[in-house]
């Protein structure tokens, strides 16, 4: 992670660090493809935490622009997924370390830019395991050629949600993106 205190001597602009990290990840993805890997999932909690105004303010206070993250940052991540022969998934979560989350809010704030700019990704894996995830309406912004994986089962609870509740949530999501996707 970029830190104004520790990173500035090497990276005056946080997006320079992000671009260098993406170069490393892209090289690793190419090597995995060369070895026969056909699916790579990139975890991008930054996009998930931007749904929360408090997290946006925190990042802005560190000098990491929300607007640049949703444009240049998405483009940087998208460049990682430009390896032929590999299906790429983009996992957008809101944090889950030791069953603790770090952001609350729906995807309305980020959906338009993240989904439309992530052209090299084939699959979006989205956290929807409780009410703080917001409505399914932002799924309407997922391009037609993309697959959506709904994270409906919570890893934060000791018990699995009842099947009828999960089916009802799938049916609700299907109002915005077809079940076949």
Pin down the residues of each PLM region:
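Domain-level signal for soluble alpha/beta catalytic cores
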Residues: 1-181
């Amino acid at each position: 992670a970029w830190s104004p205190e520790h990173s500035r001597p090497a990276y005056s602009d946080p997006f320079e660090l992000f671009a260098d990290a993406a170069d490393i990840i892209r090289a690793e993805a190419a090597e995995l493809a060369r070895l026969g890997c056909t699916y790579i999932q990139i975890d991008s909690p930054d996009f998930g935490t931007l749904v929360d105004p408090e997290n946006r303010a925190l990042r802005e206070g560190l000098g990491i622009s929300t607007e640049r993250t949703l444009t240049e940052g998405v483009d940087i991540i998208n460049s990682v997924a430009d390896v032929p022969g590999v299906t790429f998934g983009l996992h957008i979560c809101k944090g889950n370390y030791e069953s603790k989350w770090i952001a609350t809010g729906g995807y309305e704030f980020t959906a338009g830019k993240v989904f439309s700019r992530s052209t090299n990704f084939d699959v979006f894996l989205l956290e929807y395991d409780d009410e703080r995830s917001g409505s399914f309406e932002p799924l309407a912004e997922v391009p037609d050629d993309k697959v959506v994986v709904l994270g409906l089962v919570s890893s934060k609870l000791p018990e699995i949600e009842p099947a009828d509740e999960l089916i009802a949530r799938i049916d609700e999501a299907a109002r915005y993106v077809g079940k076949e996707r």
